[in-house]
């Protein structure tokens, strides 16, 4: 009997831990961390301090988890109204809103403290600004009131590379703001592809996402426009900023070409949810691989290999007889 009670208590404890973990929407966080890490690698010329990297990513994780938890508290009414989200911790009754608020505050305080003590004040303030912008501007002011909610609100998701850059340098350069702009421009096609998939859910709770207000065809047209803007804009890191080189250029060309192709497919069939799902999934892969390209391009080893290839080519050219 005692053993059974212990097992039950352990199971209940694990269920509580799982519920609080779910409040943070953990599937969203890795992409934010990847953009943070990419900025740190570029800012450090491929020689980022591993301890600084780990501390910054941990602080970023805590800040993002706090923001998502606060979002769950604010949106508990629409989460309960939608069948897809009714099982989330707060609408299902597994976590009380007050307890979730305390949890979110603890996460934010830990994040801020970690940044201030082990990184710098600039990164700490930027991380907190991300939480504030996400909650006040996107969640409170825009999400339920404007079909342009994700366009402006996307700035919150664009802050992580600023945090990463500031963690390394203590300030922000044009390259840091270029990374911010790339993610800002990428967010609408990424999120609207998702909104096309779950349009009915948003309509049910009167959230004016673009597909609900303007319809699928207009939304896809906007996705097409933003894609045609963001893909060429990614090359600003190469010229004129010279923050990235040939490896990143090749990666951005291939990934951008596929991004445009998938958006074009959806443009031909704007009502096709499978194509919207395919674009949504690819947009995640696109950003992950684009950031990976930034990291690889920044490494000293990459520069040495490119220089060696260039020297070998020059040697071969010099051996060609001229007549």
UniProtKB/Swiss-Prot annotation:
Pfam families assigned: UbiA (PF01040)
Membrane topology, record value: Multi-pass membrane protein
Pathway: Porphyrin-containing compound metabolism; heme O biosynthesis; heme O from protoheme: step 1/1
NCBIfam families associated with the record: cyoE_ctaB, PRK04375.1-2
Other observations noted: Carbon 2 of the heme B porphyrin ring is defined according to the Fischer nomenclature.
Family to which the UniProt record says this protein belongs: Belongs to the UbiA prenyltransferase family. Protoheme IX farnesyltransferase subfamily.
Protein name (database record): Protoheme IX farnesyltransferase
Gene designation per UniProt: ctaB
């Amino acid at each position: 009997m005692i053993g059974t009670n212990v097992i039950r208590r352990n199971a209940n404890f694990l269920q509580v831990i799982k519920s609080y973990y779910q409040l943070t929407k953990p599937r969203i966080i890795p992409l934010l961390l990847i953009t943070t890490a990419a900025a740190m690698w570029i800012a450090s010329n491929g020689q980022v301090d591993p301890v600084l990297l780990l501390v910054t990513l941990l602080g970023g994780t805590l800040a993002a988890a706090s923001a998502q938890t606060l979002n769950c508290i604010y949106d508990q009414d629409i989460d309960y109204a939608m069948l897809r989200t009714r099982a989330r911790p707060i609408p299902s009754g597994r976590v009380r809103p007050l307890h979730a608020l305390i949890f979110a505050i603890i996460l934010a305080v830990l994040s801020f403290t970690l940044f201030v003590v082990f990184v710098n004040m600039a990164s700490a303030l930027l991380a907190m600004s991300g939480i504030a912008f996400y909650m006040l501007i996107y969640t409170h002011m825009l999400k339920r009131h404007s079909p342009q909610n994700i366009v402006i609100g996307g700035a919150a998701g664009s802050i992580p590379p600023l945090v990463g850059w500031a963690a390394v340098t203590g300030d922000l350069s044009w390259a840091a703001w270029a990374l911010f702009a790339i993610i800002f421009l990428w967010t609408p096609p990424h999120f609207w592809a998702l909104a096309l998939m779950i349009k009915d859910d948003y309509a049910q709770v009167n959230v004016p996402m673009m597909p609900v207000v303007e319809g699928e065809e207009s939304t896809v047209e906007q996705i097409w426009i933003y894609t045609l803007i963001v893909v060429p804009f990614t090359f600003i890191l190469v010229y004129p900023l010279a923050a990235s080189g040939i490896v990143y250029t090749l990666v951005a060309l291939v990934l951008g070409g596929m991004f445009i192709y998938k958006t074009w497919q959806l443009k031909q069939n704007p009502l096709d949810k499978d194509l919207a799902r395919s674009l949504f999934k690819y947009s995640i892969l696109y950003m992950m691989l684009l950031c990976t390209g930034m990291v690889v391009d920044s490494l000293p080893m990459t520069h040495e290999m490119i220089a060696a290839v260039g020297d070998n080519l020059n040697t071969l050219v010099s051996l060609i007889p001229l007549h």
